[in-house]
């Protein structure tokens, strides 16, 4: 029976951690190892983790100095022994059948990745699909959908074969580490199978890593840099993706530059780098048919 490693970065999660870990221990797929990585918590999160390790031998607890979510995930990947890997954030929780369902789908369809739908809210609010829709996406289509960010690049609603992760690790980022990690492993994925069943639940809270920087400068800046990089790569390798990538690079660059202007930081390296990209591709940006007029006006005036 295949082993699934479930990786949970833990940081000051007193109010949510037990719900999270209980949902993993309650999985109908029982051959699990649960790696709880305490990332320098200042509350009693580590003690809660150790309590679970004493009760269930499948729980492995690690403690490290605070380094952020990517660092904690990478630490766990270095110690994981499973054939499959899943990721759950410490304030999220999952349906009892999530990993059994995804593992079965991946086995049936010989897929490298399995994905389910997610939702915000309570588990009892979930509505099961009357008939589960199964979608199998082959390598070329899957690559295009994620590379252009048409599909979300989250890792928490997915199950991965360990073999496709290999030595890949999460890059340090405040907002888009999942997106950057998925970009690294994209060329290795030959097939993904997904279901519309809602098996994963997430929480939005003020200090949630994935939400706290939403619609802020940091989010816009990191996405701008990422899409600029993808666009420049696509010019040589994937010309069919160029228009959408340039649209995203431009819109996020404009948002980040506006935020820097508001803070009177036009002389920073970040602003200068964003402006240089916009200048270099100004003609192509202004020719984009579906780029919002407000962005074109900003490019025309400020670049």
Task: Give the residues covered by each predicted segment.
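Cell-envelope/extracellular polymer assembly enzymes that use nucleotide-activated donors
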Residues: 2-5, 23, 33, 180
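Short beta-strand/loop segment that forms part of the nucleotide-sugar
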Residues: 8, 31-40, 60-65, 90
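Short, well-formed alpha-helical segments that are part of the catalytic scaffolds
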Residues: 12-26
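A conserved acidic beta->alpha catalytic loop
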Residues: 23, 30, 38-47, 68
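Glycine-rich, basic loop-to-helix element that forms the pyrophosphate-binding segment
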Residues: 64-80
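Donor-binding/catalytic cores of nucleotide-activated saccharide
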Residues: 69, 90-193, 203-218
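Short aromatic/hydrophobic "clamp" motif used to bind/position activated sugar donors
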Residues: 85
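Membrane-interface aromatic/basic loop that binds lipid-linked glycans or pyrophosphate carriers
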Residues: 262-303
